[in-house]
């Protein structure tokens, strides 16, 4: 029994159990904005909603979704003309960033037409986002990813689905997911 969930001990116990392949249910309360995988996905969503958002694009490029190094990002940002957005500079590049540009072009082309859930699912499946996030952040990233998908579905049932609306809805309150622990389940 852990007295509080705020300390790092609780998170470390869950991580150690997952690494030891013990059947673990995870935390009973998950604050999705604290999950790194969720932050990476929402950074990409923020860029898709507003391509002029240099910070969100930089965060997405450095995330496991694209795997850019600090040097690659610095080179792109430093060598761009004055008053040029990072997205414009990336589009003007030739060569090395072809795969990144293809993914971003695909997602930008769909951002105005797909519902938030479908857009997130496209990032995670078609473009290998789930695999990349879990490979870099560990199995515990799956909990945050699944919670974000569930929240996207919940949002779509309560509001007219739009990407900017979903991002505002996520920001409006600290979204916490409370899990129902199944008594019949043989999980820690």
What do these predicted ranges mean?
Residues 1-75, 86-88, 102, 109-113, ...:
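Conserved motor-region signature of P-loop NTPase helicases/translocases
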Residues 76-82:
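Amphipathic, charged-and-aliphatic alpha-helical interface segments
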Residues 95-99, 104-107:
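Basic, alpha-helical interaction scaffolds
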